[in-house]
Amino acid sequence: MLIHPQFDPIALHLGPLAIRWYGLMYLAAFIMFLWFGRLRTRQPHIAAQGWSGRDLDDMLFYGVLGVILGGRLGYVLFYKPDWYLAHPLDIFKVWEGGMAFHGGFLGVVLAMMLYARMRRRPWMQVTDFIAPMVPCGLAAGRLGNFINGELWGRVSSPDLPWAMLFPQAQGEDRAWLAAHAQQAVTSGVQAVFDQYHMLPRHPSQIYQFLGEGVLFFILLWLYARKPRPMGAVSGMFLVGYGVFRFAAEFAREPDNFLGLLALSLSMGQWLSLPMILAGVAMLAWAYRRAGRNGNDAQAGAHA
């Protein structure tokens, strides 16, 4: 049985400025984007498209805006619309937390559409370029969630070797016990609670760090190393992320203000399903288009 170490959310102080771990994770994500982006520009089929270091810097600027604005608005609209409708000024209190990946994803999509229009590049050429780097940001974000002791997993068997006790979850632990009294006794988690005053849970942040982050990055990077039809890498990202996220949600505790929705699926799972369907459609379109044209223009230079 493991106990969450309860890290100080403040990583360091620079005079009056407090630097939080979560902020450092965002910084790490942006640095990894630039690092792997430069590696990607050296791949022959990508170099033929004329990408430069300046392109990376500009995309990062637009991407940061998309992540922050989209992530915040997505959380407001998808998860707590009633609260923010009654307390509209709280929308601007980003330091209190509240970001949604699916909203950040839509924000980045819109930001890249604007970037592609300004640079006169095909939009899918832009999204194909950045897609393999996105899992780096996902990994950094999930690591930040773990350090903060938030977004913990569902109650697990006490026999699970890596089951973890989250002191921050004690309120939800008591609510779970009240709703599942008989199950708590038969599964053995009541005995754990009697001893530690906490319930064993899945460290779902680590699952997502390893799945959506590390493993997904490796698979998508390897797929994108070779020339693919335009739109295929983006489609593969949508399918891959949707599948990884959908699976991880079975171990992640649903938001307590939402719970499980229709078919006992979480909000994260319902939002992932359209991503999977859109990704499959994009892959089918990309390869069908490449078959008709004989040789897709993915590796060609932009106008």
From Swiss-Prot:
It is an enzyme of class 2 (transferase). Its main location: membrane. NCBIfam families: lgt. Pathway: Protein modification; lipoprotein biosynthesis (diacylglyceryl transfer). One of its GO terms (cellular component) is plasma membrane. The chain crosses the membrane at residues 17-37, 59-79, 94-114, 129-149, 204-224, 230-250, 257-277. InterPro entries: Lgt. Keywords: Cell inner membrane, Cell membrane, Membrane, Transferase, Transmembrane, Transmembrane helix. Catalyzes the transfer of the diacylglyceryl group from phosphatidylglycerol to the sulfhydryl group of the N-terminal cysteine of a prolipoprotein, the first step in the formation of mature lipoproteins. Its EC number is 2.5.1.145. The gene is lgt. It is a multi-pass membrane protein. It is found in: Cell inner membrane. This is Phosphatidylglycerol--prolipoprotein diacylglyceryl transferase. A 1,2-diacyl-sn-glycero-3-phospho-(1'-sn-glycerol) binds at residue 142. One of its GO terms (biological process) is lipoprotein biosynthetic process. The keyword Cell membrane applies. The keyword Transmembrane applies. Disulfide bonds: none annotated.
